[in-house]
UniProtKB/Swiss-Prot annotation:
This is Glucose 1-dehydrogenase 1. The active site is at residue 158. NADP(+) binds at residues 11-35. May play some role in spore germination. It is an enzyme of class 1 (oxidoreductase). Its EC number is 1.1.1.47. It comes from Priestia megaterium.
Length: 261
């Protein structure tokens, strides 16, 4: 538990399921106030709110698409209107879909780039704007991936979005460090989330993925949520401009870098 997170206001994009849901619940257990964001699945968002209530937390759900500028502006403003402030912005919303690079349409490319990279930029921009205007030493956390470092065949758009996120985060961290605003990435490896459920349900595919992880197991969303809580806390007060990989050592494993996966 991080005492200084109590009363902090945390906005998490794409938090009706997966990593976002785990982070929302973790911050609620830290007694932070949480803004749950969803694009279309209101029922799932409401389910997260119920789980937050069960742990004694306080939260609201705000609908919005991170690729739509006005939606992102509204998301941040909703946080301020409901809770009076914003302390932590977590740009978690993301997507992936496998397509051979030579067959990838511009629409395929743009959809992933707009969600993963432009969406994170818009969230970062709006949060930092509020921090600067109100002299708040806030924190931005962007959800990157091991694929900001590891090439990924069939996912050139995804890898490009995460590679771009790396330098975006480093640039924002450098630009706003003098104001005490911290900006960092989390780089998850293979995690048990709904997006991976079908793959990991297949014993052969699961074993293949586990063979590329030196620690030998697929991570849980709660392990990523723990990293986010630390980065948002004062325990990480001198940390900015990094990608903290939470991947069981996957980024160090040569067989993956040789093209497996």
């Amino acid at each position: 538990m991080y005492k200084d997170l109590e009363g902090k206001v945390v906005v998490i994009t794409g938090s009706s399921t997966g990593l976002g849901k785990a982070m929302a619940i973790r911050f609620a257990t830290e007694k932070a106030k949480v803004v749950v964001n969803y694009r279309s699945k209101e029922e799932e968002a409401n389910s997260v709110l119920e789980e937050i209530k069960k742990v004694g937390g306080e939260a609201i759900a705000v609908k919005g698409d991170v690729t739509v500028e006005s939606d992102v502006i509204n998301l941040v403003q909703s946080s301020i209107k409901e809770f009076g402030k914003l302390d932590v912005m977590i740009n978690n919303a993301g997507m992936e879909n496998p397509v051979s690079s030579h067959e990838m349409s511009l629409s395929d490319w743009n959809k992933v780039i707009d969600t993963n990279l432009t969406g994170a930029f818009l969230g970062s921009r709006e949060a930092i704007k509020y921090f600067v205007e109100n002299d708040i030493k806030g924190t931005v956390i962007n959800m990157s991936s091991v694929h900001e470092k590891i090439p990924w065949p069939l996912f050139v758009h995804y890898a490009a979005s995460k590679g771009g996120m790396k330098l975006m985060t480093e640039t924002l961290a450098l630009e706003y460090a003098p104001k005490g605003i911290r900006v960092n990435n989390i780089g998850p490896g293979a995690i048990n989330t709904p997006i991976n459920a079908e793959k990991f349900a297949d014993p052969e595919q699961r074993a293949d993925v586990e063979s590329m992880i030196p620690m030998g197991y697929i991570g849980e969303p709660e392990e990523i949520a723990a990293v986010a809580a630390w980065l948002a806390s004062s325990e990480a007060s001198y940390v900015t401009g990094i990608t903290l990989f939470a991947d069981g050592g996957m980024t160090q494993y040569p067989s993956f870098q040789a093209g497996r996966g």
